[in-house]
Amino acid sequence: MLDLSYSLERVLQEDPAARNKWEVLLLYPGIHALLCYRLAHALHKRRFYFIARALSQLARFITGIEIHPGAKIGRGLFIDHGMGVVIGETTEIGDDVTIYHGVTLGGTGKFKGKRHPTLGNRVVVGAGAKVLGAICVGDDVRIGANAVVLSDLPTGSTAVGAKAKTITKDR
């Protein structure tokens, strides 16, 4: 299960409300979603796609966190208050990444192949942020709450804001 103990320690490090490993194991939906993902991912790699997706959907129903079994997730992912988190099929996540509630790591089209973001190590993605497309987010990047990221972010950078622009004129 790719070092459950390490994942529990990460939660204890990052969440001041976490008191002990048993509490984290039994009561933290981010851990439950991650455990289900690890099993679903193993099934997905062995081409048991339907069973993997079924397990993924069960985990989503129970936790409110949707992780596609095809995603590649490193060690020590911490999903805090994970309701509404979506991690797409071709997403790649490095080690010691922190994701808050309402985050989408999603695609921008329906084409096959790599269409979701790649996050480096020690990335923090704030609540409600949307990181979209086959982009690369470097190591040690901070993405602010509700930011919309559509292009690569270099190592050590901070991204904030949701800049929208009008694409049609008023009539």
Swiss-Prot record:
GO terms for biological process: cysteine biosynthetic process from serine. It is found in: Cytoplasm. GO terms for cellular component: cytoplasm. Pathway: Amino-acid biosynthesis; L-cysteine biosynthesis; L-cysteine from L-serine: step 1/2. It holds the Pfam family Hexapep. Coiled coil: none annotated. Its main location: cytoplasm. SUPFAM superfamilies: Trimeric LpxA-like enzymes. Keywords: Acyltransferase, Amino-acid biosynthesis, Cysteine biosynthesis, Cytoplasm, Repeat, Transferase. One of its GO terms (molecular function) is serine O-acetyltransferase activity. It catalyses: L-serine + acetyl-CoA = O-acetyl-L-serine + CoA. Gene3D superfamilies: Hexapeptide repeat proteins, serine acetyltransferase, domain 1. Its EC number is 2.3.1.30. NCBIfam families: cysE (TIGR01172), EPS_EpsC (NF041874). Belongs to the transferase hexapeptide repeat family. PANTHER family: SERINE ACETYLTRANSFERASE. This is Serine acetyltransferase. It comes from Helicobacter pylori (strain J99 / ATCC 700824).
